[in-house]
Amino acid sequence: MSRTIFCTFLQRDAEGQDFQLYPGDTGKRIFNEISKEAWSKWMAKQTMLINEKKLSMMNPDDRKLLEQEMIKFLFEGHEVHIEGYTPPEE
């Protein structure tokens, strides 16, 4: 059975995560406040960041950068800036 939460990112009720996807207090906050739809949007941005900045998840500094960008994107309303990327026109 799906959970409905108020998604901080979307600013509306939406389907919540089935389980905690990220460790620690940040993971608990994501589980309680971020919907599946918002998480999917973050995953696309995360993939772009990893590829364009050539981040390695084995490098603690790269993981820290990714976590900071995730928090800014999901909770603070900041767009992820990727040099040279122009979003497609709608």
Curated annotation (Swiss-Prot):
Q: Superkingdom, according to UniProt?
A: Bacteria
- Family affiliation: Belongs to the Fe(2+)-trafficking protein family.
Return the InterPro entries for the record: Fe_traffick_prot_YggX, Fe_traffick_prot_YggX_sf
Gene3D superfamilies referenced in this protein's UniProt entry, alphabetically: Fe(II) trafficking protein YggX
> Which NCBIfam families has this protein been placed in?
PRK05408.1
Pfam families from the entry? Iron_traffic
Q: Enumerate the Gene Ontology biological process terms.
A: cellular response to oxidative stress
Q: Which GO terms describe its cellular component?
A: cytosol
Species of origin reads Erwinia tasmaniensis (strain DSM 17950 / CFBP 7177 / CIP 109463 / NCPPB 4357 / Et1/99)
Q: What does this protein do?
A: Could be a mediator in iron transactions between iron acquisition and iron-requiring processes, such as synthesis and/or repair of Fe-S clusters in biosynthetic enzymes.
Keyword annotations for this protein, in alphabetical order, are: Iron
Q: What's the protein called, per UniProt?
A: Probable Fe(2+)-trafficking protein
